[in-house]
């Protein structure tokens, strides 16, 4: 289980976009794409077969997962994430929790 998944609210803790907040759009192994963060301009060649117009486009590039931290909604600060096992009706389930206060993420 990954500590950061799609849909999490995160804050950038290192790099040129330090302090910016956003929502995780994609997780790519050790990298994540965050909405509105690490935006770059790229030159796009036109491709009429695919219906792609040419020009300069802006797109979000991946950030290393070590440069972001999940945002705790209770404290509105960056927090560390842990994983613990919870037993419910004989089934063991892995859940993520905030290390600062122990509250379960997404519950």
Curated annotation (Swiss-Prot):
Keyword Kinase: no
Molecular-function annotations in GO: rRNA binding; structural constituent of ribosome
GO biological process: translation
Keywords: Ribonucleoprotein, Ribosomal protein, RNA-binding, rRNA-binding
UniProt superkingdom: Bacteria
UniProt cross-references to SUPFAM superfamilies, sorted A to Z: Translation proteins SH3-like domain (SSF50104)
Any Gene Ontology CC annotation: ribonucleoprotein complex
CDD domains: KOW_RPL26
Pfam families membership: KOW (PF00467), ribosomal_L24 (PF17136)
Keyword Oxidoreductase in record: no
NCBIfam families documented for this protein: rplX_bact (TIGR01079)
Function as written in the Swiss-Prot or TrEMBL entry: One of two assembly initiator proteins, it binds directly to the 5'-end of the 23S rRNA, where it nucleates assembly of the 50S subunit. One of the proteins that surrounds the polypeptide exit tunnel on the outside of the subunit.
Entry similarity comment: Belongs to the universal ribosomal protein uL24 family.
Subunit structure, as described in the record: Part of the 50S ribosomal subunit.
Name of the molecule in the record: Large ribosomal subunit protein uL24
């Amino acid at each position: 289980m990954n500590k950061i998944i799609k849909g999490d609210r995160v804050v950038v803790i290192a790099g040129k976009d330090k302090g910016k907040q956003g929502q995780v759009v994609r997780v790519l192994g050790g990298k994540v794409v965050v909405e509105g963060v690490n935006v770059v301009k790229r030159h796009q060649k036109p491709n009429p077969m695919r219906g792609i117009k040419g020009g300069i486009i802006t797109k979000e590039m991946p950030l290393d997962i070590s440069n972001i931290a999940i945002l705790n909604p209770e404290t509105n600060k960056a927090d560390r994430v842990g994983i613990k096992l919870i037993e419910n009706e004989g089934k063991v389930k892995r859940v993520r929790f905030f290390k600062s206060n122990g509250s379960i993420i997404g519950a």
